[in-house]
């Protein structure tokens, strides 16, 4: 059986993924699927530079801005939704293009995931309340008594992994590492993935990061976050990790000037982009790397891709 093809455009923030994907989709009738963990939320299209906020030319976009920040969501739920969209698109004879920079989503979608059941909202709330009450060290001590294998592999300072391990234990009665050693589930094993990694030269990347944040701050991002502060509690928007949100909140609370908020957000965006480049370089092995150091070189890459796909 000939496997159908999926294109993944990945790379650091502000590297031109959305523009490149939009132009490819426009030329060949492809449909675009989001693979960015923050662009799923409907309340923050500006601060996350959602492409459906930028482009409005009839291209079919999927899994963008469809979820409220108050709704429970997980990587497993994302994988199920994305795989459904991929099969729907290919059944129509179209090629899906997945665009984003969330490495975890890409890695699990392509290479498979450990089939840990979805953690119930009740368990999530209970564990987080417990953590808020007793802190990392006491939670780690509890984990050590119930799951010594996990405790030996998780540092008590690693809050995210610690909470995750305790959630899995409470929900399933099993160690999280029992799932890690099981065979991975590949929900799209009948597809071929063509992974294209955009890797701009560092100086050029930092320039585009700064320019993006400057534009976002001028493009009503302040109003967007102010509305979130008005409509939701701090607990409800605490999990929004998109760079710029924390800085704008600090500005709205009077703790930073607008210029300082922008400068801090730009610095954090550059740091985030650097981490993304490092992750994609080392974690995704089978990929096509596109390197460029000017906008002109980037435009030439687009022309080359259009020609390659046409042939």
Swiss-Prot record:
Residues with site note (Interaction with substrate tRNA): 102, 124
Domain of life according to the entry: Bacteria
UniProt cross-references to Pfam families, sorted A to Z: IPPT (PF01715)
Binding site for ATP: 11-18
Catalysed transformations (reactions): adenosine(37) in tRNA + dimethylallyl diphosphate = N(6)-dimethylallyladenosine(37) in tRNA + diphosphate
UniProt-listed Enzyme Commission number(s): 2.5.1.75
Cofactor(s) this protein cannot do without: Mg(2+)
InterPro entries assigned: Dimethylallyltransferase, IPT, P-loop_NTPase
Catalytic EC class: transferase
Keywords carried by this UniProt record: ATP-binding, Magnesium, Nucleotide-binding, Transferase, tRNA processing
Region Interaction with substrate tRNA: start-end pairs: 36-39, 160-164
UniProt-listed GO biological process terms: tRNA modification
Molecular-function GO term, any one: ATP binding
Residues binding substrate: 13-18
Subunit structure: Monomer.
Family: Belongs to the IPP transferase family.
Function in brief: Catalyzes the transfer of a dimethylallyl group onto the adenine at position 37 in tRNAs that read codons beginning with uridine, leading to the formation of N6-(dimethylallyl)adenosine (i(6)A).
HAMAP family: IPP_trans
UniProt name for this protein: tRNA dimethylallyltransferase
């Amino acid at each position: 059986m000939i496997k159908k093809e999926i294109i993944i455009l990945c790379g650091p923030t502000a590297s031109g993924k959305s523009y490149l994907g939009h132009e490819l989709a426009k030329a060949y009738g492809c449909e675009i699927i989001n693979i960015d963990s923050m662009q799923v939320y409907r309340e923050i299209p500006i601060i996350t530079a959602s492409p459906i906020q930028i482009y409005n030319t009839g291209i079919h976009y999927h899994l963008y801005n469809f979820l409220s920040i108050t709704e429970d969501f997980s990587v497993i739920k994302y994988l199920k939704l994305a795989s459904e969209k991929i099969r729907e698109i290919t059944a129509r004879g179209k090629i899906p293009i997945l665009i984003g920079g969330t490495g975890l989503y890409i890695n699990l979608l392509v290479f498979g995931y450990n089939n840990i059941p979805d953690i119930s909202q009740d368990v999530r709330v209970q564990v987080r309340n417990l953590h808020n009450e007793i802190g990392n060290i006491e939670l780690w001590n509890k984990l050590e008594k119930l799951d010594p294998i996990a405790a030996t592999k998780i540092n008590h300072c690693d809050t995210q992994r610690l909470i995750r391990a305790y959630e899995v234990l409470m929900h399933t009665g099993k160690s999280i590492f029992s799932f890690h050693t099981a065979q991975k589930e590949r929900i799209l094993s009948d597809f071929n993935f063509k992974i294209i990694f955009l890797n701009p030269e560092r100086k050029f990347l930092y320039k585009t990061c700064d320019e993006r944040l400057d534009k976002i701050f001028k493009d009503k991002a302040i109003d967007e976050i102010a509305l979130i502060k008005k409509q939701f509690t701090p607990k409800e928007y605490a999990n929004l990790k998109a760079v710029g949100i924390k800085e704008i909140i600090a500005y709205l609370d009077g703790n930073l000037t607008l210029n300082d908020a922008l400068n801090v957000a730009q610095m954090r965006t550059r740091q985030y982009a650097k981490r993304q480049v490092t992750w994609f370089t080392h974690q995704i092995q089978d990929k096509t790397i596109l390197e460029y150091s000017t906008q002109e070189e980037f435009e030439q890459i687009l022309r080359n891709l259009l020609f390659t796909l046409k042939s």
